[in-house]
Amino acid sequence: MTETTPAPQTPAAPAGPAQSFVLERPIQTVGRRKEAVVRVRLVPGTGKFDLNGRSLEDYFPNKVHQQLIKAPLVTVDRVESFDIFAHLGGGGPSGQAGALRLGIARALILVSPEDRPALKKAGFLTRDPRATERKKYGLKKARKAPQYSKR
């Protein structure tokens, strides 16, 4: 009985970057945030990003966005295990970065389902439902009313 107890704990520890993955085909997922839609392809590799034909640093010069995107890979300690090819469309930089993060997290689960609890706890699997509120007629913006004069 003592031998069966440590066995489940061994795979729960995050695998190091030395572990290589053999996939019969690339993992494909979709991430969405605000108006942005990102199609992600995950293949075993060295940690290279190809975003619409450009590198991560070239496409997202903002360091905050770069950290946001790499966060799921850092959480499961697989930064240099995969190459990521993504087609980003719609929205702005912040929405695209959030959509890419969701797509990467979903792909990592398909590769190794044992990483799901760590990614779920970090909040990387939750689709952020916040979107721009629509403008209403009679108002200047979604909620801003024109100035009111009592007399």
UniProtKB/Swiss-Prot annotation:
One Pfam family from the record: Ribosomal_S9
Region (Disordered): 1-20, 121-151
GO biological process, alphabetically ordered: translation
Record has Hydrolase as a keyword: no
GO MF assignments: RNA binding; structural constituent of ribosome
Regions of compositional bias (Basic residues) in chain numbering: 137-151
Keyword line: Acetylation, Ribonucleoprotein, Ribosomal protein
Compositionally biased intervals (Low complexity): 1-19
Keyword rRNA-binding (UniProt): no
Coiled coil: none
GO CC annotation: cytoplasm; plasma membrane; small ribosomal subunit
Stored NCBIfam families: PRK00132.1
Protein name in the entry: Small ribosomal subunit protein uS9
UniProt organism field: Mycobacterium tuberculosis (strain ATCC 25618 / H37Rv)
